[in-house]
């Protein structure tokens, strides 16, 4: 009986020492904010190419995911659902289909997103 208690005690000590070993994990956090419906690199209001868009961010995120793999965290900080006709179409015209924004965020594998003040304007 003493031997069993001793073995379990040694196993417990071994398990605790292994758990206490320090492990460094390198994370990459990519955050978007104030996208304002700029899902494509084109401004549908001015009819010109647009420098910022989720499409361009996706290209950047793909490269970063190659290096960081599952250690990349992709977040959005809100104000993404208004600003361009592509967003307004799903906000007011086609309210039954999945919203283009949610489709793009799912495709890009966002880990989380929160609402900004402009995101509640559509109701």
Model-derived segments and spans:
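Sec/Tat signal peptide C-region and signal peptidase I cleavage site
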Residues: 16-20
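N-terminal catalytic scaffold of extracellular/periplasmic and nuclease hydrolases
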Residues: 21-123
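Positively charged n-region of N-terminal signal peptides that target proteins for export
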Residues: 1-4
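Bacterial N-terminal signal peptides
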Residues: 8-15
